[in-house]
Structures are given as C-alpha cells and as structure tokens.
C-alpha cells in the first residue's frame, strides 16, 4: 500500500473505514494493559494523527508500547472518523512496523526545553512545535511576498552577499570600493572618511 502524507488526510479526509498507510515519528506514546495511543507526525503538516493500537491485534504490542519519543513507525490501518473528539479522525492500526527506534538519550524530550538548549541543536529544532510553527509562518510569508511581487511584474534577483568576514581568503577575490586601495583619501585626523 502506498504511503499517505498526513497533510493530504487533513486536506481531504477519506471515507470512514478507508485503509491507509502512514509513516512518521512519535510525538507521544501512551499505553495501558490492552490498548495504546501514538501521536504520529510526518512533518507534512503541523497536526499529528492519533494511532490506536490494541494488544489483541498486534503481535508486537509490547515492543511498540516500550518505544520512546521520536521513534519512527510505518502504520497501516483503518481510518475512523471521530466527529465528537478533538481530532477529526484517528487510525486504528492493523500493523505497526518500527522503522527506527529512538533511545532515551535522544536530546529532544517531551518536557519543555529552553531556547538556549535548542540553540545547541539547530538540526533538530524543526521537530519542536515552536520552531515547526515559526518555520511554517515564515515560509508562508516569504511565499506570499514573492508571489505578490511576481504578479506585479518584478524579477527576483539573487544579489551577492557582502560580509565583513574573510574566511579562507575569499575576500581576496574582489574589492567593494571605488577608491584606490594604494592611495586612500584621509581626513584631517588621518582616518578614512
């Protein structure tokens, strides 16, 4: 069965009872004796989907129940509409495959993390709710701005970036001045004007 992105499920929810396959990582994993819940996200949209898994349907129930946050899964199951719940639908799992376990040493945890702490792991920040939302807003704002100017006949040009850093001799390629560097005009105090 072909993988379905969560964003497409939220845009056009299939009929109740439709079989779907989704992949993603666990935002939360909760379980009791016979039933468990995974909040699964795939990065295609902000909202996760709730996966319901039951001990009598899955041989690997105990393995799944022990999985930590950010473990990646492939889930095949039945989409069930839930109009009276917080989410519009959930997926009752028929099979769950653990694609990649995630141990307790993984730096992102369910507890609140400070911005200073997240700054040390820039490659993982998009997985947090705060940065995920901020990047989506920035992406939509940039798209709207580019679309507006494009529709009004403007051309987007990638201009060179001038910086004060001279890394590995890159600044020797060209100079950004019209002055003769061998004979720079100086003011009365001897400084460059």
Name every feature range the model reports, one short phrase each:
Residues 1-193:
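Class II aminoacyl-tRNA synthetase catalytic cores and aaRS-like
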């Amino acid at each position: 069965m072909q993988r379905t992105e969560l964003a497409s499920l939220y845009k056009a929810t299939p009929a109740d009872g439709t079989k779907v396959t989704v992949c993603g990582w666990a935002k939360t994993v909760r379980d009791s004796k016979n039933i468990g819940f995974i909040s699964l996200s795939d990065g295609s949209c902000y909202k996760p989907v709730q996966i319901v898994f039951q001990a009598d349907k899955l041989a690997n129930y105990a393995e799944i129940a022990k999985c930590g946050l950010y473990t990646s899964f492939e889930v095949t199951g039945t989409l069930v509409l839930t109009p009276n719940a917080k989410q519009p639908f959930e997926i009752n799992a028929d099979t769950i495959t653990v694609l990649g376990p995630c141990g307790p040493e993984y730096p992102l945890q369910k507890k609140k993390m400070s911005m200073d702490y997240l700054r040390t792991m820039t490659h993982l920040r998009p997985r947090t709710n705060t940065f995920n939302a901020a990047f989506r807003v920035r992406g939509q704002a940039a798209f709207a701005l580019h679309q507006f100017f494009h529709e009004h006949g403007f051309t987007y040009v990638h201009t060179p970036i001038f910086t004060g850093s001279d890394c590995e001799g890159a600044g020797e390629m060209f100079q950004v001045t019209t002055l003769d560097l061998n004979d720079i005009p100086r003011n009365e105090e001897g400084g460059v004007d």
